[in-house]
């Protein structure tokens, strides 16, 4: 299975990756699903909604600042790094992710499409103000702040620039993801349940256009029925080995011209 996946990637004209919470769980970031999704006695799904923010913005921001602190302590794992290396080699053209943790960029991936936003970005609920807290150098000061964050432009509340339950995905990111999927001849799916739509359409678009689907996951998912190659295992263990095999194939090809 690994050998077949490596051949598909090494021969790909335009390969993309599609990642979900499973890849970041190995960096110690709790997923929204299962017992790990609990914070204080709340389920994440109860807090990650526009209604919850309207009702109690203090509570929602407390939850998101806790998540931000967790993510700031986390580091990209070998799977994130392997994907960045595959892009560096010219094998992967982009990483499309459902994660908001910014770990792909931390690992060195350059072309990252974030379908569900980025936890280190904030936006105003009233005007067009947006800020990337990492880029402005305010992230550590921001997570320590006890007051509700206000927009410096209009004074309204700031909210996390992420997609909450019941909200549509950002149109620009979704269009870019679908456009990449339409061009792709291989999609490498890593650590996603494949049940959150419309994001989960990405591998289906590749498949419908005659492309190949490689899946790396600890268990079967909503994507598995369309996968040409299914590799069961932890992404942090599988991906470095897959990278090594792709490198071997490409080195051999270069050697023999």
Curated annotation (Swiss-Prot):
E.C. designation(s): 2.3.1.286
Q: State where the protein is found.
A: Cytoplasm
UniProt GO molecular function: histone deacetylase activity, NAD-dependent; NAD+ binding; protein-malonyllysine demalonylase activity; protein-succinyllysine desuccinylase activity; zinc ion binding
Catalysed reactions, as listed in the record: N(6)-acetyl-L-lysyl-[protein] + NAD(+) + H2O = 2''-O-acetyl-ADP-D-ribose + nicotinamide + L-lysyl-[protein]; N(6)-succinyl-L-lysyl-[protein] + NAD(+) + H2O = 2''-O-succinyl-ADP-D-ribose + nicotinamide + L-lysyl-[protein]
**Record domain Deacetylase sirtuin-type: where:** 1-252
**Which free-text remark accompanies the cofactor?**
Binds 1 zinc ion per subunit.
Could you list this entry's UniProt keywords, alphabetically sorted.
Answer: Cytoplasm, Metal-binding, NAD, Transcription, Transcription regulation, Transferase, Zinc
Q: Name one Pfam family in it.
A: SIR2
Q: Where does substrate bind?
A: 64, 67
Q: Where is the active site?
A: 116 (proton acceptor)
Q: Which Gene3D superfamilies match?
A: SIR2/SIRT2 'Small Domain, TPP-binding domain
| Record keyword NAD present | yes
User: Which residues bind Zn(2+) per the record?
Assistant: 124, 127, 151, 154
Q: List the disulfide bonds.
A: none
* Co-factor(s): Zn(2+)
Plastid listed as a keyword: no
Q: Name one GO cellular component term.
A: cytoplasm
The entry's NAD(+)-binding residues are: 20-39, 98-101, 191-193, 217-219, 235
Q: Domain comment?
A: 2 residues (Tyr-64 and Arg-67) present in a large hydrophobic pocket are probably involved in substrate specificity. They are important for desuccinylation activity, but dispensable for deacetylation activity.
Q: What does this protein do?
A: NAD-dependent lysine deacetylase and desuccinylase that specifically removes acetyl and succinyl groups on target proteins. Modulates the activities of several proteins which are inactive in their acylated form. Deacetylates the N-terminal lysine residue of Alba, the major archaeal chromatin protein and that, in turn, increases Alba's DNA binding affinity, thereby repressing transcription.
Q: Describe the family membership recorded for this protein in Swiss-Prot or TrEMBL.
A: Belongs to the sirtuin family. Class III subfamily.
For this entry, the protein name equals NAD-dependent protein deacylase
Q: From which source organism is this entry?
A: Thermococcus kodakarensis (strain ATCC BAA-918 / JCM 12380 / KOD1)
């Amino acid at each position: 299975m690994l050998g077949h996946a490596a051949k598909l990637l090494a021969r790909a004209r335009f390969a993309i990756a599609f990642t979900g919470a499973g890849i970041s769980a190995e960096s110690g970031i709790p997923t929204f699903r299962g017992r790990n999704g609990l914070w204080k006695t709340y389920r994440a799904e109860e807090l990650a909604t526009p209604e919850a923010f309207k009702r109690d913005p203090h509570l929602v921001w407390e939850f998101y600042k806790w998540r931000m602190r967790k993510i700031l302590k986390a580091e990209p794992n070998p799977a994130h790094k392997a994907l960045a290396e595959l892009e560096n080699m010219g094998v992967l053209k982009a990483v499309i992710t459902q994660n908001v943790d910014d770990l792909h960029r931390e690992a060195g991936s350059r072309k990252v499409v974030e379908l569900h936003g980025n936890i280190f970005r904030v936006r105003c609920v009233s005007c067009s103000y947006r800020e990337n807290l990492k880029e402005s150098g305010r992230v550590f000061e921001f997570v320590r702040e006890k007051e509700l964050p206000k927009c410096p432009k209009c004074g309204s509340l700031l909210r996390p620039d992420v997609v909450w339950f019941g909200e549509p995905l950002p149109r620009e990111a979704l269009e870019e993801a679908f456009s990449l999927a339409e061009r792709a001849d291989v999609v490498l799916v890593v650590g996603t349940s494949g049940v959150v739509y419309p994001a989960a359409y990405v591998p289906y678009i590749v498949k419908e256009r005659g492309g190949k689907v490689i899946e790396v996951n600890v268990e079967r998912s909503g994507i598995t029925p369309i996968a040409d190659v299914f590799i069961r295992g932890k992404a942090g263990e599988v991906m470095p080995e897959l990278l090594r095999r792709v490198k071997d194939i490409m080195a051999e090809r270069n050697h023999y011209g």
